[in-house]
Amino acid sequence: MAADPSSNSSSVPAANGADYADTASAAYQAALQVIESVEPRVAAATRKELADQRDSLKLIASENYASPAVLLTMGTWFSDKYAEGTIGHRFYAGCQNVDTVESVAAEHARELFGAPYAYVQPHSGIDANLVAFWAILATRVEAPELANFGAKHINDLSEADWETLRNKLGNQRLLGMSLDAGGHLTHGFRPNISGKMFHQRSYGTNPETGFLDYDAVAAAAREFKPLVLVAGYSAYPRRVNFAKMREIADEVGATLMVDMAHFAGLVAGKVFTGDEDPVPHAHVTTTTTHKSLRGPRGGMVLATEEYAPAVDKGCPMVLGGPLSHVMAAKAVALAEARQPAFQQYAQQVADNAQALADGFVKRDAGLVTGGTDNHIVLLDVTSFGLTGRQAESALLDAGIVTNRNSIPADPNGAWYTSGVRLGTPALTSRGFGADDFDRVAELIVEVLANTQPEGTSKAKYKLADGTAERVHAASSELLSANPLYPGLTL
């Protein structure tokens, strides 16, 4: 058994790496020398990427800064090992060390989130969602049909019975949050594979307030009768009552699947508790391991005992060989998240988002729902006469990295959009506090107030002379006061 990090009274090493900068510097300098000897362009781009990240206000809600411990864990010979299967049941010999790191990662995930079961193999959030979808289909559709046919395995079915099962698997219903309300492509939308798996319908938000309307969700569920009710979001700036979502799912006989990819760090950090913690209420919970959780890029599935056996068959159901080096990094990141300092970090993420929202409100900038109570602020840039694409580009000119995003009933569609999504996890990892985020709001408003559309184009814009330079200089002061990976020299 791995040691319980929650008993460790020391704080988590800062994500900026200050606690072991000399060691990390030596490791990266040596690594880059090796890379440079083989392909100098990659080494140069790696150095340039660090410089770019250090010199920009990163407000993309889905990005963060992993600790050097997490980053270094990914650069090992675990990358060389195939390990298809599950712990103790691999299709390859010699996987005992992979079994160890996968076991440690799963143990940390179970303890951190209070889940009966954790599956840490998915390579990404979409892989985690696909594993969850197919586990639900296997449990709710495939298993009963096999029993009806008197078969133990799909390979035992005749061609006719197999075709019957395939048709039934492909004829199920999913109800999820609409894209313009803040949902995600992987929640059953046509351009994504999930939209080709299910008959999908969407629920939205109250058109006047922008908040979830649980009565409307319940009405949609009663009418549509989905097999799967998906809760979770990528651009909704409020908390969700998952107890209510479970009540709705139970009423219509649906499986509640929660995608907490964006806010897993706030769950791990105990900012979201009770009805706002999805894990006790969902049948299946999916997440990424980066974003607010501050780990490596990857995915994870948590499940009740009912769904665990099907989720455990993620390979070969959806996945092939797991990325063993990334599973090892997940174990390190989850160990960090179990330490007390991560709870302080998560609370600061939420506090900083509130400060950012308040900074916009007092400067008369429009916000979807009028504010936030998670880590996301969704800025309605129509209040500046701009599209999301124009705003995103103008902000980038000034060294502020954001992403355009749809807002409810968006008149500019999903490409140009009318919103800009902002998130606080990354800059919080650098040490930014509430006063810093008020200043960030001021700088963003300064850029947008000095940006004008060019003609009728939804993409072209003109930024007033001197604005980009002035804002970039001001943001550089904030960044210098809160350095990224201080002491790390390349």
Swiss-Prot record:
Coiled coil: none
Originating organism: Mycolicibacterium smegmatis (strain ATCC 700084 / mc(2)155)
Pfam families documented for this protein: SHMT
Site keyed Plays an important role in substrate specificity: positions: 290
Top-level taxon in the UniProt lineage: Bacteria
Protein name from the UniProt record: Serine hydroxymethyltransferase
Enzyme class: transferase
Catalytic reaction list: (6R)-5,10-methylene-5,6,7,8-tetrahydrofolate + glycine + H2O = (6S)-5,6,7,8-tetrahydrofolate + L-serine
Disulphide bridges: none
Cross-link Isoglutamyl lysine isopeptide (Lys-Gln) (interchain with Q-Cter in protein Pup) residue location(s): 362
Subcellular location: Cytoplasm
Biological role stated in the UniProt entry: Catalyzes the reversible interconversion of serine and glycine with tetrahydrofolate (THF) serving as the one-carbon carrier. This reaction serves as the major source of one-carbon groups required for the biosynthesis of purines, thymidylate, methionine, and other important biomolecules. Also exhibits THF-independent aldolase activity toward beta-hydroxyamino acids, producing glycine and aldehydes, via a retro-aldol mechanism.
